[in-house]
């Protein structure tokens, strides 16, 4: 084929001819097609585009990555709606936390209890999206002071304690033991054995007008547990304690045995029980004992009578539970 000066120049995207060597002779046309920089640039751009498209395709072949990218986009909106739901129920958590602090002591961090309860709600909500057969793993390293519910049941079974069988079809999220384990509240005891309320210490006849009593807060300090108010009731649940009612607290305040506490709980313990504990192996030789903190006092007959009835009620309930308990196998 003969080369002429009518060889067509490569056109750019706008249709205009790109500048190149002047077509002065017929022999330059073939060289022009091979060395035109526009052609080289087009080829290079196609290679780059093809490579970039290939990389993007590789990134989206993993379904987990694709879904996580979508989740990351939606997460802020989801968080806002979750926060709205928690705000709706926050008043209940706040009232419960303040009630716990009033009953246990000022050392309880109400805000921490609320945060733990909210985290527990989120943990239990995961069960809504479980497969049914798969169990959601719990972060045991975050709960060093609490045994797993299954482990505690196995230990109770080895000791022969009766454990009620779980009902079939009941979701794990409604099991009280799991709920307690998820909150992380290590100050609440978890025991497989019922509290023993029997023997001479639970005989109402031991209470009379000459019996001396102490405040629970002072007993707590006397046994070296002053830093954690209410710990004595957790460590020794078998102790008899009487919750003073408003009439009792008014009398105690008038006699200067305690300060006016308003709505806070005030417990009365038997001084003899506390001194017996201090002499036991658990506290013998303990450097933190401060028995001088025990400021004992006697009570009027009308208050002693109420305490007798209360002790009798607790003891009777304990006996009924023992009778109704299934025999051990």
Curated annotation (Swiss-Prot):
Protein name: Deoxynucleotidyltransferase terminal-interacting protein 1
Disordered: region residues: 1-27
Biased composition regions of type Gly residues, renumbered to the chain: 12-22
This protein's record includes keyword DNA-binding: yes
Phosphoserine modification, residue list: 161
Important for dimerization: annotated span: 56-147
One MF term in the entry's GO annotations: nucleosome binding
Name of encoding gene: DNTTIP1
Quaternary state and interactors: Monomer and homodimer. A minor proportion may form homotrimers. Interacts with ZNF541. Interacts with the terminal deoxynucleotidyltransferase DNTT. Interacts with TRERF1. Identified in a histone deacetylase complex that contains DNTTIP1, HDAC1 and MIDEAS; this complex assembles into a tetramer that contains four copies of each protein chain. Component of a histone deacetylase complex containing DNTTIP1, ZNF541, HDAC1 and HDAC2. Identified in a complex with KCTD19, HDAC1, HDAC2 and ZNF541.
UniProt lineage: Eukaryota, Metazoa, Chordata, Craniata, Vertebrata
Pfam families tied to this protein: DNTTIP1_dimer, TdIF1_2nd
Motif Nuclear localization signal, residue range(s) on this chain: 164-170
Gene Ontology cellular-component terms listed: histone deacetylase complex; nucleus
UniProt region (Important for DNA and nucleosome binding), positions on chain: 197-316
Main location: nucleus
Record flagged with keyword DNA-binding: yes
InterPro entries cross-referenced by the UniProt entry: DNTTIP1_dimer, TdIF1, TdIF1_C
Record remark: domains: The N-terminal domain mediates dimerization.
DNA-binding region: 159-173, 216-237
The organism of origin for this protein: Bos taurus
